[in-house]
């Protein structure tokens, strides 16, 4: 019975499928486009392919109208995203990214919600030099975007360094194992000579095939009790199971994803469901087989319904699990107990194993730059020059100066104090629990501000927070400029999605540990209405909450918002 349901949706393939099919394994005419001297942009077809190489063509939307008036083409520039599984960089790699941001980018770095770097403002003529410099630092941008498996995340956990290190190694191997096999990236950016002859498709891309996946695919590994990576937001999530201080394996969760489309109830955020347990060395097999199920049965006709979450919901969880076990040739074990208690970061100095220290730094909005009164970028540059451990980027857009020896701790602490780098302790816990996507001016999808606006909105919300004695109460707040959900808005206890300039849909009721989605509370409201609503709700929370009750749980218990029990009733 189950296998009768195993088929892809009917319908003509989307235009992106045509582009991939004609691209000769992601080559297209990218090489020629990048050499074309007249325009700073590239063709639409090549831009679709460019994602698989880790980049998006963008333009400065702040300048768009003025340039149109002057009959100039948009101020085209590229965003470049690094593939860095687990978010771990060496100090030397940090310094290379810093230098490239200054030399070819807009002078800043964005720390992303998938634990990696983004550089913005790179001109077409500088792209190849930038990618080659990244390659020289033993990093790359392969498959950082596009219809493939993206950057593999793992918990940035300074408390259990040995377990973290082991999980990081698995995430790194998994990322490497799931890379596209085409040599297009190496030929276009690294001047690798093309091998003569046309090999068969299964030789070029044995797992992905010539069309790759119907849509992007995201994997993350969480180490309880921290759900900092929001494991249930992933297409494929692994939950580390630790027994007697040893990693015994992973619970497997499938079918999560945050993106949706305004006004289309057939699109919705969804949480991954746990379907079983596997041993550590089995995660490659599980991941590969899940990806091939999505390759074979995902929606290639309608891209907004093409994510794996819709494949799982359409076919049914049991059907997908049965097909997975059929392809594996073995069955998953029963899922093991686990417990998450938060999805935020833990700030400040922490002592880990082997006498090593870790300092988690608060980076508002993940933007590393020098402000007039806060030399964040310079301070981190000076630390990287003397640091002998590593630097871990977190999925909440912060960073950890990790594996600091006791001898180095004093000097690094002096630099932290000299440059005023902060663990955020003088901010409200709400601000420390905030994340925002880039949005305007560079993201072409943004309908409203996010990163540039959320800190200003929090300034005003903080007044309500302080008045009600909630300064130290962690409440997750997230803002995205569009419904694609890069800042995982649907897992924020307070969430905002941009609807139009200055207007947002407001969401409430997600779980503090990332195990429940929010629900829309108010539609298309501006700052005045946002603050009015919070002036009513936050004082009630301060007065009426039970001991230890989180804000997302309170608004449901108090009847302020209806509970979302599954993504399929997100819009109800």
Swiss-Prot record:
Record keyword NADP present: yes
Protein name listed in UniProt: Sulfite reductase [NADPH] hemoprotein beta-component
EC number: 1.8.1.2
NCBIfam families: CysI (TIGR02041), PRK13504.1 (NF010029)
Family listed: Belongs to the nitrite and sulfite reductase 4Fe-4S domain family.
Protein keywords: 4Fe-4S, Amino-acid biosynthesis, Cysteine biosynthesis, Heme, Iron, Iron-sulfur, Metal-binding, NADP, Oxidoreductase
GO annotation terms (biological process): cysteine biosynthetic process; hydrogen sulfide biosynthetic process; sulfate assimilation
Pfam families: NIR_SIR, NIR_SIR_ferr
Pathways per UniProt: Sulfur metabolism; hydrogen sulfide biosynthesis; hydrogen sulfide from sulfite (NADPH route): step 1/1
Assembly mode: Alpha(8)-beta(8). The alpha component is a flavoprotein, the beta component is a hemoprotein.
Domain of life: Bacteria
InterPro entries (UniProt xref): CysI, NiRdtase/SiRdtase_haem-b_fer, Nit/Sulf_reduc_fer-like_dom_sf, NO2/SO3_Rdtase_4Fe4S_dom, NO2/SO3_Rdtase_4Fe4S_prot, NO2/SO3_Rdtase_4Fe4S_sf, NO2/SO3_Rdtase_FeS/sirohaem_BS
Reaction catalysed by this enzyme: hydrogen sulfide + 3 NADP(+) + 3 H2O = sulfite + 3 NADPH + 4 H(+)
